[in-house]
């Protein structure tokens, strides 16, 4: 099985996903990463625990034209590699990846998104609900599985989101 992990920056994968990659390797998976290379500014971090790394110019700002470049590059990578599973992380990494993976889902690729904490939650500013909730709800339609970190996010996703929630 071939798995792609995406995030806005490579340091996110280094800091949070090494245990996941180890489990995937134990199950015989080949793991690739697509994210912006920011490791030069992160002393001691290296993506030496995956088979392939793609430098994709994601930007944290939704207004950045780099996200369009990231979308185009990622779409080509996904078409070339034909992944079985694409697991995306971080808000913009998740949005751009899910858009780029739409066609591959039609051919059986599963797309997972880990929400490391919704920006809309009980007590959050109304602005957060107005902006972020509709985006997550819409993008859940092109997501096979949403993985939540907190119990509050899990309960909210179970009620409001269109895909399978864990």
Locations of the language-model features?
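Membrane-proximal helix-turn-helix segments that form the acceptor-binding/catalytic region
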Residues: 22-27, 72, 130-147
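N-terminal subdomain of nucleotide-sugar transferases
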Residues: 1-37, 81
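Nucleotide-sugar donor phosphate/pyrophosphate-binding loop at the beta->alpha transition
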Residues: 16, 65-72, 110, 120-138
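Short beta-strand scaffold positions
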Residues: 35, 87-88, 148-149
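Active-site proximal beta-strand in glycosyltransferases
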Residues: 2-4, 102-118, 136, 147, ...
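Glycine-rich phosphate-binding loop signature in dinucleotide/nucleotide-binding domains
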Residues: 77-84
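Short His-centered aromatic/hydrophobic patch
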Residues: 88-94
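Helix-loop-beta element that forms the nucleotide-linked donor phosphate-binding surface
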Residues: 47-51, 154-166
């Amino acid at each position: 099985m071939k798995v792609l992990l995406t995030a806005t920056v490579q340091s996110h994968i280094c800091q949070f996903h090494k245990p996941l990659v180890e489990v995937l390797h134990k199950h015989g998976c080949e793991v690739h990463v697509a994210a912006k290379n920011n490791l030069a500014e992160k002393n001691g971090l290296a993506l030496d625990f995956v088979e392939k790394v793609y430098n994709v110019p994601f930007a944290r700002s939704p207004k950045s034209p780099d996200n369009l470049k990231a979308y185009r590059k990622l779409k080509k990578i996904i078409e070339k590699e034909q992944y079985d599973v694409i697991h995306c992380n971080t808000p913009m990494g998740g949005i751009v990846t899910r858009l780029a993976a739409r066609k591959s889902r039609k051919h059986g690729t599963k797309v997972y998104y880990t929400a490391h904490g919704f920006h809309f939650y009980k007590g959050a500013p109304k602005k957060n609900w107005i902006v972020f909730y509709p985006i997550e709800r819409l993008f859940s339609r092109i997501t096979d599985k949403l993985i939540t970190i907190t119990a509050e996010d899990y309960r909210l996703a179970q009620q409001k989101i269109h895909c399978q929630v864990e």
